[in-house]
């Protein structure tokens, strides 16, 4: 397990961009709620710790992890958010259902990231047993929800910076076109 040597809740606050003006959506699966509530608490507390006001954090619940895709899609379409975190927990059982749900959710969230301009952060535990999930939702390995919140802040910042850069480049392009037009007019008037 990749988290054995890492505490998911640890981060250097000095490396986190200012998040006080960002708005975040969190879509939480009700399935395995003892785990998903722990993940949500970790995410919420990390956002608050990084100066995101509570009223700028929107929470929606969905029945299970597979429904996270639709919930995130609708949040992206209807809420003015800078990033969305999807929180779920799928634990290996004795059937292939685990594989189908994990693959479907992973692909669905990946598709949202490709199709939209707002980052969707994947915080879905896919563990072999309940103890592994407990350990990663506030247990001995920290809280994956905290890690997801920090990723959401960083990705919202990247989105913001890309938008600023794009706007600046558009400004330069328009300015350049206007300068060319002015030069052409001067030449024509000579």
Q: What does each model-found stretch correspond to?
A:
Residues 1-20:
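N-terminal amphipathic/basic leader segments beginning at the initiator methionine
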Residues 3-6, 33, 48-53, 73-80, ...:
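Generic secondary-structure signature for well-ordered alpha-helical cores
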Residues 14-62:
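Glycine-rich phosphate/diphosphate-binding loop of Rossmann-like nucleotide-binding domains
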Residues 30-31, 89-90, 125-129:
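Short, ordered loop/turn segments at secondary-structure junctions
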Residues 67-109, 113:
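Glycine-rich phosphate-binding loop
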Residues 99-126, 135, 144:
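Short, acidic/small-residue loops that bind anionic groups at enzyme active sites
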Residues 142-177:
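A charged, well-structured terminal subsegment
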Residues 171-190:
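Accessory alpha-helical/coil subdomains and C-terminal extensions
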């Amino acid at each position: 397990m990749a988290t054995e040597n890492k505490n998911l809740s640890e981060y250097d606050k000095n490396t986190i961009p200012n998040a006080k003006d960002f708005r975040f959506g969190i879509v939480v699966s009700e399935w395995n709620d003892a785990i998903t509530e722990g993940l949500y608490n970790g995410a919420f507390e990390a956002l608050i710790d990084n100066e995101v006001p509570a009223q700028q954090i929107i929470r929606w619940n969905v029945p299970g992890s597979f429904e996270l895709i639709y919930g995130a899609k609708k949040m992206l379409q209807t809420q003015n958010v800078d990033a969305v975190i999807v929180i779920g927990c799928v634990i290996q059982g004795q059937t292939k259902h685990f594989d189908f749900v994990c693959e479907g959710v992973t692909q669905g969230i990946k598709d949202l990231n490709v199709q939209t301009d707002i980052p969707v952060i994947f915080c879905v535990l896919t563990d072999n047993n309940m103890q592994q999930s407990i350990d990663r939702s506030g247990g001995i390995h920290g809280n994956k929800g905290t890690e997801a919140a920090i990723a959401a802040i960083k990705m919202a910042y990247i989105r913001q910076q890309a938008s600023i850069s794009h706007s600046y480049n558009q400004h330069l392009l328009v300015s350049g076109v206007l300068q060319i037009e002015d030069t052409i007019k001067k030449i024509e008037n000579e």
